[in-house]
Amino acid sequence: MINLIRRFLWRLLGIDYSHILRVIDFKYLKEDAFKSIGNKSYDNGAIVYRWSDAPITIGKYCSISYDVKFVVDDGKHRYNTVTSYPFKSNQISAKRGIEIGNDVWIGLGSTILYGVKIGDGATIAAGSVVTKDVEPYTVVGGVPAKLIKEKCTREEAKLMQEIAWWNWGEEVIESRVNDFRLSYADYIQKY
């Protein structure tokens, strides 16, 4: 009875209560309708939280560990107004989305927030909360995620992106798989 009265009052006041009553606001990445996943990328049960059709774009050869969460928009909550409570049902989530480059590894239990772009070759340490863009060929970690180290020099990172091995055909990649164990300098010199 209390729930009926509560819903009646919320309707009378013009408050959208549907989001409060929902039990599930997420989908598994594999089931998400607004995702684009590149060749050979995989996940182990990543979850997408969304309240809009903001896209998730994942490049080729990405490894996404178990319990990774993608929060693709702000869920109608504002941080720069008097209250963050979503009073009006006509509030629209700011569509931000998430963009992940190629050859990215996202560690166990990490959370990637809306508006973030993760560069090619980046590594996200387990348990990180990524709130800002991640440069190519860097390792970030923590809450919020911060630079831990660069995997190679900035010049080498640019050259690796020019080589773009992830765009080679599968047969070419398979024939060169042992070269992936080379140092960045040796690999760049070879290709």
Model regions: which residues?
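Membrane-proximal basic amphipathic "stem/tether" segments
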Residues: 1-29
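C-terminal segments of enzyme domains that contribute to small-molecule binding surfaces
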Residues: 8, 32, 87-112, 144-191
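Flexible, glycine/small-residue-enriched loop-and-beta-strand segment within the central core
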Residues: 25, 36, 42-116, 143-144
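Residues that scaffold the ATP/ADP-binding catalytic core of kinase and kinase-like folds
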Residues: 73, 81, 133, 148-150, ...
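Beta-rich strand-turn-strand
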Residues: 108-122, 128-132
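Short conserved catalytic/interaction loops centered on acidic-Pro-aromatic/His motifs
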Residues: 119, 131-141, 150
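Conserved G/P- and acidic residue-centered "switch" motifs that form tight phosphate/ATP-binding loops
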Residues: 124, 142
